[in-house]
Amino acid sequence: MAGGVLFFVIMLPGPASDLGRYMDLLSARQKLVASNIANADTPGYQTQDIDFQFEFVTMANGQQPQTIRPRGLKQTPDGNNVDLDREARLLAEDAIRFNVASSLLRGQIKVVQEAIQGGGNA
């Protein structure tokens, strides 16, 4: 998001602010997934992720989410546990989530802009 839009989102109450935080978490997860993919052949590398439910409830605006190491992933003999199929699935799912959230946020911003410009008068 552009700096002005991010500031605008932070200043919005309730759902818009929550959408902004949710999108921040999705962005952070995308970076982790990209790192996981980049390290798929690195001996000893352990997959990292974000616990969305915990982080969404506890994360303050602007604070970086804590990473977790997902359990139950198959480890290779060199100690690496990156599952490229899992990472590709996460990228696709999160892209869809981000698109939905950004559409909802655009709608909320449009309502506020119309109210500010006087277009919301009945």
Residues covered by each model-derived region:
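Amphipathic alpha-helical polymerization modules
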Residues: A2-A122
